[in-house]
Design a protein with these regions (language model features):
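Polar, low-complexity loop segments and adjacent catalytic/binding residues used for recognizing
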Residues: 1-268
């Protein structure tokens, strides 16, 4: 199939920090494959930033209180420590990659929700912005969000709350979008999350084909509600040679949990 989902999970584990990611090593593997069947708080391969934590084997990107309720204006990020050689400046070769993960976005009973999470690709030494809660999803802020010249990032957003820059504004319409150097998505599709129960597990798969330059995303639920979106983007024009991948999420005045249950990634 076009969209590959890594079945064998390498039981890597995970380390919690609140600083920026480490610098890129002098050398790194040309082919990268990793997977998590669950998350373990004691392993150094995943860096946690901001409010991200591990709870019950899941990667919880935003904060909850002592009763397990999501809290407002929380921002959390998690990224894999391994630098990925996305493209080669000497010969122009570009990598293919695929990723799959399961997740739960839970409002804990509220009919209002916000704000969402994203899977992202970013420079290996990215400094994450401050003031990035709410609709900025932990990846942008008011100064950078709509100015591509100030960003170097590609993200797949699972956006629960419709902001001014989102499709169908001012009507509320959760959506999956592909972001290229801006919080305003270049391609979107409705995300049927509001039709699902609070604890519904969704499965997402994404694939990048280096020949066609097509980035494709699929998200589905066990009841066969699903969505798919894609766009053409030459990542050599957007991202540096070396990148890292991870997740970011935020709440604003409205809240929900953002939990990643498992994750696989392969690039070659």
């Amino acid at each position: 199939p076009l969209i590959k989902f890594l079945i064998p999970f390498l039981l890597l584990q995970h380390h919690s920090v609140n600083s920026q990611p480490p610098p890129s090593p002098i050398s790194a593997y040309e082919t990268v494959a990793f997977g998590f069947g669950f998350f373990d708080k004691d392993d150094p391969n995943v860096f946690l930033l901001g409010n991200a934590s591990v709870s019950g084997g899941a990667l919880r990107l935003t904060n909850t209180d002592q009763f397990g309720k999501p809290v407002p204006h929380s921002v959390g990020r998690a990224l894999h420590i391994t630098p990925i050689h996305l493209w080669n400046k000497n010969n122009g070769e570009l990598a293919d990659f695929s990723s799959g993960f399961s997740f739960v976005v839970n409002t804990k009973g509220s009919t209002l929700r916000g704000d969402g999470f994203a899977f992202f690709l970013a420079p290996a030494n990215l400094n994450f912005p401050k003031n990035s809660s709410g609709g900025y999803l932990g990846l942008f802020n008011p100064e950078t969000a709509l100015d591509p010249s100030k960003n170097q990032i590609v993200a797949i957003e699972f956006d629960s709350f419709t902001n001014d820059w989102d499709p169908n504004s001012p009507n509320q319409s959760p959506h999956v979008g592909i972001d290229v150097d801006s919080i305003k998505s270049v391609a979107t599709v409705p995300w049927p999350s509001e039709l699902e129960p609070d604890n519904a597990v969704a499965h997402a798969s994404l694939n990048y084909n280096s020949e066609s330059k097509r980035l494709s995303v699929f998200v589905g639920y066990p009841d066969n509600r699903n969505a798919t979106v894609s766009t053409i983007v030459d990542l050599r024009n957007v991202l540096p040679e070396w990148i890292r991948v991870g997740f970011s999420a935020s709440t604003g005045d409205l809240v929900e949990t953002h939990d990643i249950l498992n994750w696989s990634f392969e690039a070659a």
